[in-house]
């Protein structure tokens, strides 16, 4: 069953003219500079009012050509491993560089120390293995904790607090590790939890209470606490007052720095995927349209999560006169984007614009079936469009072998 997308639909692209839309190749990703800046202003305001530091989780959005747009607003980057950490260091050398990985590789760790300022470990065993080297290199060291507090509904695949989770250390696991290795606490500078996914601040408040209940004895000894990501801070209606109360409470109670590392919040509603109808057909009672984009290749979360992305000038199935199932051109039978309704029938050559396509798209797409990677364009704050990067046959071929 598809999860209904809770993100707000968009009513239009104010800065994009019909002429520019006509010139865009399809499929293509179109990043929106003005919306990136609007998101940045919101996140900067939270930092200014609370003293927290907000990082960009590059796993969600790593289009480094627009890092200069975000640079005035962010404190640094968060990485999931060596390559993202290097990207953050290369493109934002003056900003903080944080990294968390479920398990680090010994053959990569020395290089990682060149890029990261803060290194968060997932388990006491990883802390014991790599912590001394990180400490000797002058890094700030953290441990990801599992407060065993699930607040998610509808997409348990993203719940790090699910039973048997591999992510984070429970209090029982920590106590057992310290009993066997009393030197571990001296390595720690901070704690990190990441339990949310596209959620409001009420879920954070519940989670924070669980963190304090289970780990209160450790917090006064820490220098920082990282609230992780999954905070939909820039979504209309998000409870900023609740978020800021949570941050200020921790800072005042424990005298420590607070970090947040959202990914989606930086680029929420700041990108589009422009596509063209290749064919229309009917199977029984179902009207279908084949697009030149693929859910499986270009928007994997549509299938993985799953969710139904917003589409400009379209309604829910049955809401408007003509309901159509939109799908991609690959051989995967489930390469379906969703059912939408329109005021008029779709025709070959029609252009469609999906919204909120900056996040978890360009960083997750693939070339299954030999599908080309869409080029990435930028809609500038001045209303002009320009291509940031173009992909071709060699990008497909050279992922699969060498000449």
Predicted ranges, named:
Residues 57, 194-196, 225-234, 262-265:
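Glycine-rich beta-strand-to-loop/alpha-helix junction loops that act as flexible
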Residues 205-210, 239-245, 275, 341:
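Charged helix-capping and loop-helix junction motifs
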Residues 5-104, 108, 294, 342-348, ...:
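N-terminal capping/small domains of soluble enzymes
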Residues 246, 257-403:
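Charged (often Lys/Glu-rich) extended helix/loop segments that serve as interaction or gating elements
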Residues 49-224, 246-249:
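Active-site-proximal beta-alpha core segment in soluble small-molecule metabolic enzymes
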Residues 149-151, 197, 233, 266, ...:
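Feature marks short, surface-exposed loop/turn motifs that line or immediately flank catalytic pockets
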């Amino acid at each position: 069953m598809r999860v209904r997308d809770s993100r707000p639909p968009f009513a239009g692209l104010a800065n994009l003219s019909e002429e520019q839309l006509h010139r865009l190749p399809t499929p293509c990703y179109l990043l929106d500079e003005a919306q990136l800046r609007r998101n940045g202003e919101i996140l900067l305001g939270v930092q200014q009012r609370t003293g927290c530091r907000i990082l960009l989780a590059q796993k969600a959005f790593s289009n480094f050509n627009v890092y200069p747009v975000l640079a005035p607003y962010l404190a640094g980057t968060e990485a999931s491993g060596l390559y993202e950490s290097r990207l953050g260091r290369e493109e934002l050398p003056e900003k903080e560089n944080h990294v968390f990985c479920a398990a680090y590789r010994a053959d990569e760790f020395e290089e990682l120390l060149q890029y990261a300022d803060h290194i968060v470990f997932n388990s006491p065993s990883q802390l014991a293995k790599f912590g001394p080297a990180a400490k000797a290199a002058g890094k700030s060291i953290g441990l990801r904790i599992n407060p065993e507090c699930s607040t998610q509904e509808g997409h348990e695949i993203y719940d790090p607090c699910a039973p048997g989770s591999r992510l984070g250390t429970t209090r029982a696991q920590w106590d057992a590790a310290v009993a066997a290795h009393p030197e571990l606490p001296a390595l720690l500078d901070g704690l990190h939890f990441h339990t949310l996914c596209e959620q409001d601040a009420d879920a954070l408040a519940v989670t924070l209470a669980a963190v304090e209940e289970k780990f209160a004895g450790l917090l006064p000894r820490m220098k920082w606490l990282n609230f992780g990501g999954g905070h939909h801070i820039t979504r209309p209606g998000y409870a900023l007052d609740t978020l800021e109360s949570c941050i200020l409470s921790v800072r005042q109670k424990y005298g420590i720095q607070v970090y947040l590392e959202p990914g989606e919040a930086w680029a929420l509603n700041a990108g589009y995927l422009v596509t063209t109808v290749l064919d229309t057909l009917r199977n029984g009672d179902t009207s279908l349209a084949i697009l030149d984009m693929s859910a499986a290749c270009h928007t994997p979360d549509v299938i993985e999560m799953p969710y139904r992305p917003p589409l400009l000038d379209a309604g829910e199935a049955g809401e408007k006169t003509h309901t159509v199932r939109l799908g991609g051109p690959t051989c995967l039978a489930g390469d379906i984007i969703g059912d939408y309704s329109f005021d008029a029938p779709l025709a070959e050559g029609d252009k469609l614009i999906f919204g909120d396509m900056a996040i978890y798209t360009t960083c997750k797409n693939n070339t299954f079936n030999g599908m080309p990677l869409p080029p990435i364009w930028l809609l500038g704050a001045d209303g002009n469009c320009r291509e940031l990067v173009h992909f071709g046959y060699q990008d497909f071929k050279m992922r699969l072998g060498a000449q």
